[in-house]
Amino acid sequence: SSDLVHEIRNPLASLKSASEIISDTEDKNQRKKLVKILTHDVERIERLITDYSQMLKDEVALSKEQMNKIDLKFIVQSVVDDFNNIYISKRGIKIQLKINNSIKEFKILGIENRIEQILANLLDNSISFSENNKIILVEITKDQNDRVILSVIDQGKGFKEQKLTKIFERFYSNRPDKFGEHSGLGLNIVKNLVELHGGIINASNNINQNGARVEVIFPKL
């Protein structure tokens, strides 16, 4: 695909430059920096290819899967528990789940493992922008039209306003350098999965505090 080729060109150019310089560099510290650049660029290319391949597989698989009535509450609880088991001890980041208890159930028409993937990718994104010992809030509620809403709210730096329309584009990534763990496909995959379920996804910055909010609205059953 042309967009994959375009995205690989940047790390390839950097890789080529670093490899050309390193053989003529005698300074140990400079060589270490160049090796670090080489490693980072190779990993970036590997992530791009792996994620793109997975996305293509997902697109084929999605066309074959059947949707069922499922309660979002139990799926979300399971994913939140899994993430807390990893990140509370690893980085002190806690995922808090807030459910509107006045609502008995949160039924949607969906594919269970794809719903898990939506939340997992959103949490991955929030965690990558969060500093250690912060809280990420996952909220489930319904709007006045009885549509189920899943929100992920973090305490990171938020999105740059002018880039809010771009964050769901394929390969877009505004991630800080120290969090270079993803290819920029995560939110694009989420958008595709949400739209497969007939839903809407929105992103915004928190008005009264730092951080960002991503909201997924599922259609009424």
Where are the language model's segments positioned?
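Short alpha-helical segment of the dimerization/phosphotransfer core of two-component systems
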Residues: H40-I45
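Conserved micro-motifs of the catalytic ATP-binding
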Residues: V60-E65, E105-G110
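Short alpha-helical Gxxx[C/S/T] motif in the catalytic ATP-binding
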Residues: G186, V190
